[in-house]
Structure formats: C-alpha cells, structure tokens
C-alpha cells in the first residue's frame, strides 16, 4: 500500500468552524496513525469572499489545536503551491486534457464536464459503506460546470486536480459532500486516475437536532482559546463528535487518540454538539495537568483580569485546579485572595449568632503558636466542639468572612495563603450589614 496522504482544504471565507476543525482533526489523526502525510491546502478561488484574516485564522486555529501539517503554507513541499489561487497553470493544463478528450463543452461562456452516463456510479465509503448514484438520466443530473465564463475554475474541478497532483490516498470530509463524490469520481476517471478512498463523516447537529450554524454557541474555534479551553481538551471533545472507542473511555491525550483512532469506528449517525460535555472534557484535562503547568496556563487570564502579579498568585491558582472547567474561570475564583468582596447571597446565609463565634474564633487563631493550614482545620474542629456547635456552624461563616463566597478553595489553603494577620483581620471585620 502506498504511503497514506490526507488533506484539510478549507476556504478562507470566514472563521474556522468547529466542523472544519473536526475535519482537520480526523485527517490529522488518520495520517499520524498510519505514519502518513497530512497536507494543508487553501482553497482560495472565491476572490469575492476570501480574506487574509480568515486565512490567518485557519493557521492560528490549527496551530493552537496542535494539528501540525507536513506540507502546505509555511512548510512547503513537493506538490506546491498550496494556495489554489497560485495553481492556475496546472488547472489550465488539466482542462486542456479534457478538451482534447472531448469531455467538456461550452455553455453560454462557461464550460461543462460531460458525464459518462453509461452506468451508475458506485463507490465504497469507509464510514457509510457502498453508495450508488445513478447518473444515466441527464434531467436529474445535468452536466456540471467546471469553468466560469470569466475563466476561473469551479470547486469540483480544482479539488480533483489538486487531489491528483498532491497524490491523495484518502479524502475524509463531511457527509454533505457525498453527493459531490460521484462527480469527482467521474473526473478522476476522465483523467485516467484511480480515485482515492473516501470517508464521509456524520454531520454535527445542535442538541435540538438542527444543523449547527456559524452563529451557534461553540461554533467558532477562535473563541475557545479566549474562553480558557485547553487545546488538548478541545481536541479530545472534537474526536468524540462522531468517533468513539470500543469501550467507555472518554478522556484521551493527543497521543492516545492517535493510537486508538480508526475510520471504521466513526459513527454513521449525526453527532450532537454539547457545550456542557465540552466543558466537562476540558475540566478533566485541567485536573490532569501538573500544578506548575496549570498555573502557567492560568496566569495570563489572571493578569488580564487585573489580578496582581503577586508572590502568592501561582499558589492561589493551584487552589482551584479541581474546581474550574476553563482557565477563564480562575480569576473570579481566586480574586478574594487579593481583593475581598462580599457575595450578598452568601452573607445572607450566615446566621446572626455566628458573629459571636467568629469573634471568638479570631481570638483563638491569633493565639495559635504555629500557622499551618491543615493543622488549623483541626483547630476549627476543636473550637466547634468546645462551643457545642457542629463543624458547619464554624466553617461556613469563616469561609464567607475570609472569601466573601459560599464555596471555593479548601479553607486550609485559604488560611495558609492569607496568613495569620490577614485571616484574623478579615474575620474581625466581617459583619452582616
């Protein structure tokens, strides 16, 4: 078998959609699994809609996601150029081949490809199975235009020519292209080339079953870095949109995905996009990070949110590693370490009789010979017992007084990072007003 070659061929007419990112991922995973080559090709033949900003967004999105390409823009390769707008001489040569073979004809200035109508077109799809489409009736399947009256070439033609020139062995794309495949197969055969193997992935739908559009929440890949998602978390989630392993495992590193991915395990039915599931998957990857790495990744979000570059910042970040689903949630979770505010709802849950307990607790903490967060939890337990109350009657008011919140990091960490003086000051300053 020849070396596997796959490609991602986006059009730079808008931001990188989550569906396009999944297409790129499945092509990348298959190439990496098979020890093959992954190619990035920019299909920029729509001059009216192409933008440099969209092209940059494609590069940025793929680099962020970790989808490195072996050939393509900025990498080069033997089959370039990798922008379709720079390949017109190649297209002209292939168009002439069709002219010489009598397979094209002019129609009001445009040029159409003459289908072979002697038999239906049948092909085997690695995901969808055997597919047959009957092209014998010209009224149902008119000959397709491949060149416009202005001389520019249409998607179907350039797509096939590039796949031939770039020696593609597998074309992995969305199932919305299934009806294009027989057209493309006829072009391959007209050039005397064996078509690549096709695999059409299921569509991505919203939870209500509607087709996901560019305006839907989570549709734009570019929003994920801004919202604090990890690239490995998003990659993991995208892989589960249509593919599943043979067991119940859901969390995979990129290398684990490469090892377990197969096109045969891609589902036939449509995938449902669930942003809640995406956040959960991302949280599992956050929890799995070494503490130092988590702090390194969360730090820019904290500084951007106005938190000080304090000596305790990294330690404060570490206190919420198991409590956030995205990095963007970190600043608000730890802001109290640096700027104490009070959540009115949390304060309203503190009983008036707790104030006297808190003042006594402040005196007790001030006199503790050693200041160790874990040991101080034991002090609170003893204090509660001495005063004839349950632990919660001490812990909750203390948490609100120290953090302004009803939930958050372990109190042992709060004690340790605030220190004795600030802890005592906050407890004594707390009021229900």
UniProtKB/Swiss-Prot annotation:
SUPFAM superfamilies in UniProt: An anticodon-binding domain of class I aminoacyl-tRNA synthetases (SSF48163), Nucleotidylyl transferase (SSF52374)
Annotated GO MF terms: ATP binding; glutamate-tRNA ligase activity; tRNA binding; zinc ion binding
Coiled-coil segments on the chain, per record: none
Localisation per UniProt entry: Cytoplasm
Gene Ontology biological-process entries: glutamyl-tRNA aminoacylation
GO cellular component: cytosol
Keywords, sorted A to Z: Aminoacyl-tRNA synthetase, ATP-binding, Cytoplasm, Ligase, Nucleotide-binding, Protein biosynthesis
Motif window: 'HIGH' region: 10-20
Residue numbers covered by motif 'KMSKS' region: 211-215
Catalytic activity: tRNA(Glu) + L-glutamate + ATP = L-glutamyl-tRNA(Glu) + AMP + diphosphate
Keyword Nucleotide-binding: yes
Positions of ATP binding: 214
Enzyme Commission number, as recorded: 6.1.1.17
Family: Belongs to the class-I aminoacyl-tRNA synthetase family. Glutamate--tRNA ligase type 1 subfamily.
Name of this chain's protein: Glutamate--tRNA ligase
Gene that specifies this protein: gltX
